[in-house]
């Protein structure tokens, strides 16, 4: 039976030649998936699964380490002596799962003053990770960021604009993009019961804030996507060769709601599991306006992305700090 979630081979886009016939056909498939579903799986993405598996091992080792080790990276809300506010570790007492939020690992204490955003933080990973693990996390962040840029440039091509405008929206170190590890322990009870269909959930129904989310889910799965028309829920099947992509509120805004953010949730499961999403989010000082994709001239009006993000995060309990 054909899956509700389409699978797209994006290898024609990897050489940055967006004008070839194969690349144009691939971009059209992405456009259709974004409009019809808001979710799709990608293969041929160029990221080695040895790298992904290694990153997952690093995440699992961290979550299975001592509470003291994890709390070294917890935000100030939970550990008063810590300086970080936005990034870091949050315990499962918050919303039924543990998490670790990492920003761009290129950020160093010496250059923090350059960035006028509370969301740009230096997180000292040496407190909880060894140097090889930190290097692996940094490399993966860079690789998944580059992959996200390729997908976004594909969207830009749909609007017949120069793909270089991507640099106006996304700048390393200024980006608020987040590499997150979600760790679902042996949950003794669901986070909530769906009001729509009574299903027990391990993660509440929500949409994401950024342009794209690129997710790796382990074979235990549990992710479901809602059909916007009939409101039914569909499983996202596990594919060990694929990464899962979904549209977020920032892309919905920039595209004038052509590409809508899609509701998704995670089913309650007593088995331990982990997912690794990457939230591709613009630079904090990028001015969000629909003319970025749709207009021929730049417009001074708009909302800075960090303010857009602040409004979006209000619905997530783990960010109520």
Stretch-by-stretch model annotation:
Residues 1-321:
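Peripheral, non-catalytic segments flanking oxidoreductase cores
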């Amino acid at each position: 039976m054909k899956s509700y979630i389409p699978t797209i081979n994006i290898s024609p886009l990897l050489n940055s030649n967006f004008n070839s016939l194969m690349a144009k056909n691939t971009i059209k498939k992405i456009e259709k998936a974004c409009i019809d579903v808001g979710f799709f799986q990608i293969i041929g993405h160029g990221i080695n699964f040895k790298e992904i598996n290694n990153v997952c091992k690093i995440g699992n080792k961290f979550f299975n380490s001592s509470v003291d080790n994890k709390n070294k990276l917890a935000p100030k809300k939970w550990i008063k002596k810590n300086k970080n506010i936005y990034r870091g570790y949050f315990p499962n007492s918050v919303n039924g799962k543990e998490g670790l939020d990492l920003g761009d690992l290129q950020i160093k204490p010496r250059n923090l003053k350059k960035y006028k955003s509370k969301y740009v933080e230096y997180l000292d990973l040496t407190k909880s990770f060894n140097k090889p693990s930190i290097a692996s996390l940094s490399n993966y962040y860079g690789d998944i960021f580059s992959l996200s840029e390729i997908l976004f440039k594909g969207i830009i091509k749909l609007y017949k604009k120069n793909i270089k405008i991507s640099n106006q929206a996304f700048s390393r170190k200024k980006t608020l993009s987040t590499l997150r590890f979600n760790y679902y322990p042996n949950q003794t009870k669901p986070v909530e019961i769906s009001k729509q269909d009574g299903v027990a959930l391990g993660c509440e129904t929500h949409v994401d804030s950024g342009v794209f989310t690129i997710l790796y889910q382990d074979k235990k799965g549990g992710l479901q996507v809602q059909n916007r028309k009939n409101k039914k829920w569909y499983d996202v099947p596990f594919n060990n060769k694929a990464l899962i992509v979904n549209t977020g509120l920032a892309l919905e805004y920039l595209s004038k709601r052509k590409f809508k953010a899609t509701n998704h949730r995670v089913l309650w499961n007593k088995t331990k599991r982990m997912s690794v999403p990457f939230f591709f989010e613009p630079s904090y000082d990028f001015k969000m306006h629909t003319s970025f994709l749709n207009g021929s001239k730049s417009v001074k009006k708009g909302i800075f992305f960090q303010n857009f993000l602040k409004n979006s995060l209000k619905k997530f309990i783990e960010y109520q700090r």
